[in-house]
Amino acid sequence: MSKTTYEEYLKRYGTLIYKNTGTSMLPLLKQGRDAFIVRAVGEYETCKKWDVVLYKRPPESYVLHRVVRVDDNSYDILGDNCIGIERNIAKDAVIGVMTGFIRNGKKYEADSRLYKLYVLFWCKPYRIRILMKKIWLKCSRIWRRKD
């Protein structure tokens, strides 16, 4: 029996609910606790800045990260807990857009006020957050060397 890809699933059902893995979308999504809800992206649809998108990263992995820049043919994408921006992700690599998530059995919509506050205070100042995280990582290495 063959495995169904995310693209095939979204094409067939239109929506995907899936448990995330990894720490790249902390604090929004925590592995083992939360599930995300993604809808298929329309053929000619352009995602917006701050959308969380599911995209295919060659050769065979899928990533759920946030759009931080929209260009004519590509996106720059960053995980909420990451310091490295993935640049020039082709628009056709994006297969879905997060419409919400489920935490402890409760559904949260991506267009809710609470979610928009999270985007305002956590996501929009991403350049400052990246700088602070890099400083923290550098200091941590220095402190470890002293021990």
PLM feature spans:
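Extended hydrophobic leader/signal-anchor segments used for secretion and membrane insertion
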Residues: 1-147
